[in-house]
Every structure is written in C-alpha cells, then in structure tokens.
Amino acid sequence: KNVVKGYAESSVYGGYTANSEFEFLTGCTKTFLPGNPYLQYIDDYLPSVISNIKSQKGYGEAVAVHPYNPSGYNRNRVYPLLHFDRFLSIDDFKNPLLIRDYISDKSDYEKIIDLYKNKKKDKSLCVFNVTMQNHNPYNFDYVGDVKVTDFSVSSQVEQYLSLMRKSDDALKELITYFKKSDEPAIILVFGDHQPHLPDSFYEKLFGKNPVQFSREDSMKEHLIPFMIWANYDIGEENIERTSINYLSSLLLEKAGLKMSDYNRYLLELYKEIPSLSATGFYDKNGVLHDNKESTGKYAEMLKEYEMIQYNYLFDKDNRLDKHYNVMK
C-alpha cells in the first residue's frame, strides 16, 4: 500500500556510486558525460533536487549521510555545492554495528531516525543517505544465512545475498518506525549499481559469457530496483523500467511538492524516453536504441537534453537559473 516500485537503469556497473548519486541529485544523465562528475565537473553551486526541496514551505535542514570516508569522490566538497546543510560521515557514528568492515544498514538507518527525532519541531527534514554495508568485495570472512547450491561461485554470491537480506531487515525496521509517525514521511530507496560478482555467476543467469552480451543484456545488467513508500496516500504503481536521472523528479511528483521547469521537462521526456543511461535508451514503445543515433525524433530529443544539461553544468554565465529552481 502507498508504494511506487520498479526498476531503473544505472549508468554504472560494479562501482562508481557517485555517478548514480549525480544523476539522481541533478537530473542529469551520464549519457553525455565521460568520467566522474563529482571529481571533474562540480566546482560551484548548482541547483539540485535538494535546493528545490529546501525551497518548499516548511522545509528546514537537508542532511547527507554516508558512513564512510568523507573525502571519497570529493563528497565533502560536492555536497555543500548541491545545497546540503550538513554531511555526516563515518566520523559521526559512535560504536555502530559493523557487518564485515562496514557500518551496517541497521546503524545507518538508526542515524536517520535520530536525525528525525532531533529535527526542529516545526520543520520538515530532508535526508540523502548512501549506505556502505553491501560494498564489495564479497570475499570477507563472513558467514551469512543465505545458501546457494547451484553456483560454482557460491561463496561470493551467498555473501552478497546474505547482505541483501540484512538490508531488507533494516529497511523493514525503518519503514515500521515511520509508519507510526504522526507526521507525513516519504522514502525513496534505490540501488546504485549491480554488484561486481564473478563472470560465471552472470553466465549462469544469462546463459552466456558476459563478453558475448548484447546491448539488451548489458541494459539488464545495469538495472537496479527502486521503491517510493509513504505513510500517506500516494497510490500504487509498478514501473517496468525507468532510469536514475528521472527518479528525483518522480519523487517530487509523488510527494506533491512544487517542481521546477526542469523537473517538468524531465517528466515529459520520461513519457517519450522512459529509460536512458550510458548504455543505451528505451523509447515509450519498448524499443532499445543506441545513444549515438543521429537522426529521427529521439535523436532530436536527446540533443535537446544534452544542450539543457550543458547549460546547467557548464554555461555559468548564461545558465537559465529560473529554469532549474522552484520559483516562489
């Protein structure tokens, strides 16, 4: 009940979490960008979903949480430029529960609840949380409770699936807490990328070696699950396929918050090109395309998106700020 769920295309596989963060927080796509935006492109303040949420009536603090090294991917420098008020890193967790060498999702979510309990009474709170529990590698000395009997790489697969089960348990506790809250709460959970497991595992799943993957296979390899849940009525919806660059606009829409022209543009683009990543894109009819298409309706749409993204990221002197910000 009150759940919008489905699958989203990620532009990365097996790592580079910050690229998925970038797509979500900015609405940009890695389709048009090489490298890592956190390390290469963000050197000044940028409008973001965070600045737009903070501009809404009744919103107070926006906090980023990542229970690991604060300097990883330049997060300690980039988060303030995307309008976070605070950044809590591994240094802000006292005696957390560890699973393998990483702070557990359980302790991570307890930090979110603690932030909520200590927020200003008359203000809403926005938290962007990047967990660490399930980070690779998956060959730690760790005995989980999921057993796989079919795969030759069962030890790594078992470890990853056992970690996912721990994540499910922690998420259940988080949602149970906010179900009981008298204040409205909405939670979006999404994966950053698929795990880097041995090729033999994916060969078993796909029936072929990854070096033989088609573009369609590669798109499947980049799919991640997402879920929007609220403790109030947002309806129910199953979304077969979208991409991370659209998720923040979908969240604003489901939460009933004001949107910028840019958010509305992305939701219109989503109707025509519902899934877009560095690997390729699907049109509204479910047809898979190469990003390098140079002619036709969808090529024109992608060119427009690329120009808007250039104006947003790089054209500081001519940036159409009113297009990217919620106008009061």
Predicted features by range, described:
Residues 1-328:
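Solvent-exposed soluble domains appended to multi-pass membrane proteins
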